[in-house]
Amino acid sequence: MLLCACSAKTPVQEVIAPAQTETAAAEPQQTVSMEAVPVKTGVVNDGSSFYYYGQDGNRVEKTGMQTLGGAQYYLNGDYTLHKFVPGPNDCEGTVYIHAGDGGFTFTPHEPGVLELDGALYEVTADGSVLQDASDGYLCFGPDGRYTSGNETLDEGVQALLGAACEEASSREEKLRQAYDYIRDNYRYLSMQHYDAGTTDWAEEAALSFLETGKGNCYCFAGLFMYCARQLGYQAYVVAGWESNPTNDHAWTMIEQDGKTLLYDAQLEYAYLYMFHRDPVDMFGAEGQDGMYRGFRYYFPEE
């Protein structure tokens, strides 16, 4: 039977399935980490030593006292940092007085004389101390400590101050305590007099007084002068006359606060222990026309 054309199948009327293309699973992408390497800044321990690194990450290669990051540091010759301890610090021969706790940053003391553990220093504007130098009547050795130039005398004066002065006392109080101690614990003994206007006798007189506990006005004046200097005062002795131009006498003068004041421990001693009269006060006496609290002093230049 013939079928109509519309119902007849064509020879190639097979459905051909489209080719199945498999897409490969995408592999994860390899990402490179872009985290920044920390930049060294400030105080950095590079193994066994400490250095200072600037904000640019470079090591600071300067020497001496430097202001870095708003603080002060001392950089040695090899650029390592000096670690400070409280008090004196020898930084490659220069002594600095550190006012803070231990650490690498430096805290200076106020400029001026400074007593630490029985030693006297003079702090300069940059925090270092005077070394192998003098300021007026005060001489400082290589280690920055005040010295009379005689080790035996220095030790004797420090021992006297240790016995006379209370530890917590101010410098002004210690001066008075030393003065009173000399007046009350040493005795008068007639000894050699020295020419008016000379001062080179002070060391010998002070040493003799410390050794024997006895001496004349030159001994009183010399020993108190060295005590005052050990406390940081600009003190000196005068050989002149008292009461009249023929009465040899010696006393101590101290320059302070724009004035020059007179100290005469031996005259006080005489009124208390020799004359047995009412005590006089010759501690820090101001003068006018040679008169000091009722007593006439004749200076060599007059």
Locate each region found by the language model.
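Mature extracytoplasmic/luminal segments of secretory-pathway proteins
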Residues: M1-L3, G162, K214
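Active-site nucleophilic cysteine motif
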Residues: K174-A178, G213-A228
